[in-house]
């Protein structure tokens, strides 16, 4: 007891070692058990559920992100393929258009040349007919002149 008095503690103080100490220890253990079973475990369960929910959402988000990246890559490939196909189709259409234009131009030139040749042949025919007619008229006129000259003599 001298030791307790030396530190200024008196009997009936805060840390008296007597029969109430084991009772207090039992109360602390009982309170810890009650708090653990009524408060800490349910809160822990809620926290664990929330952690599982968050981790599942993160995993799901990562999976969806990887799926989106795959789809994006696939769509970019399809887009590039579509662009290439469109360029090929446009090129083919331009070639076909040029071919049709050249064919139409050649046909028009052939028709123009045929019309020109027909007109030339017609002109030659008419020229030949006119020459023949002039020749015949010249022959008739010369015969007429000869006949008049013969009659006058």
UniProtKB/Swiss-Prot annotation:
Protein topology in the membrane: Single-pass membrane protein
List all membrane-crossing ranges. 23-40
Q: Write out the entry's keywords from A to Z.
A: ATP synthesis, CF(0), Hydrogen ion transport, Ion transport, Membrane, Thylakoid, Transmembrane, Transmembrane helix, Transport
Look up keyword Transmembrane helix and say if it applies: yes
State a single Gene Ontology molecular function: proton-transporting ATPase activity, rotational mechanism
Subcellular location(s) per record: Cellular thylakoid membrane
User: What Gene Ontology terms describe where this protein resides (cellular component)?
Assistant: plasma membrane-derived thylakoid membrane; proton-transporting ATP synthase complex
Q: Which InterPro entries match?
A: ATP_synth_b (IPR034679), ATP_synth_B-like_membr_sf (IPR028987), ATP_synth_b/b'su_bac/chlpt (IPR002146), ATP_synthase_B_chain (IPR050059)
Q: Does the keyword Metal-binding apply?
A: no
Q: Which Pfam families match?
A: ATP-synt_B
Q: Quaternary structure per UniProt?
A: F-type ATPases have 2 components, F(1) - the catalytic core - and F(0) - the membrane proton channel. F(1) has five subunits: alpha(3), beta(3), gamma(1), delta(1), epsilon(1). F(0) has four main subunits: a(1), b(1), b'(1) and c(10-14). The alpha and beta chains form an alternating ring which encloses part of the gamma chain. F(1) is attached to F(0) by a central stalk formed by the gamma and epsilon chains, while a peripheral stalk is formed by the delta, b and b' chains.
**What does the UniProt record say this protein does?**
F(1)F(0) ATP synthase produces ATP from ADP in the presence of a proton or sodium gradient. F-type ATPases consist of two structural domains, F(1) containing the extramembraneous catalytic core and F(0) containing the membrane proton channel, linked together by a central stalk and a peripheral stalk. During catalysis, ATP synthesis in the catalytic domain of F(1) is coupled via a rotary mechanism of the central stalk subunits to proton translocation.
Recorded family membership = Belongs to the ATPase B chain family.
Protein name (record)? ATP synthase subunit b'
Task: Tell me which species this is from.
Answer: Prochlorococcus marinus (strain MIT 9312)
């Amino acid at each position: 007891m001298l030791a307790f008095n030396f530190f200024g503690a008196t009997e009936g103080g805060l840390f008296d070692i007597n029969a109430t100490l084991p009772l207090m220890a039992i109360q602390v253990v009982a309170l810890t058990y009650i708090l653990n079973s009524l408060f800490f475990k349910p809160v822990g369960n809620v926290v664990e559920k929330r952690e599982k929910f968050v981790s599942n959402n993160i995993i799901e988000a990562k999976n969806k992100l990887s799926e989106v990246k795959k789809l994006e890559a696939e769509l970019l490939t399809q887009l590039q393929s579509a662009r290439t196909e469109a360029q090929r189709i446009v090129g083919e259409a331009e070639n076909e258009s040029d071919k049709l234009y050249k064919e139409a131009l050649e046909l028009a030139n052939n028709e123009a040349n045929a019309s020109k040749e027909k007109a030339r042949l017609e002109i030659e025919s008419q020229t030949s007919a006119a020459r023949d007619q002039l020749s015949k008229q010249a022959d008739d006129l010369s015969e007429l002149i000869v006949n008049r000259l013969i009659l006058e003599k």
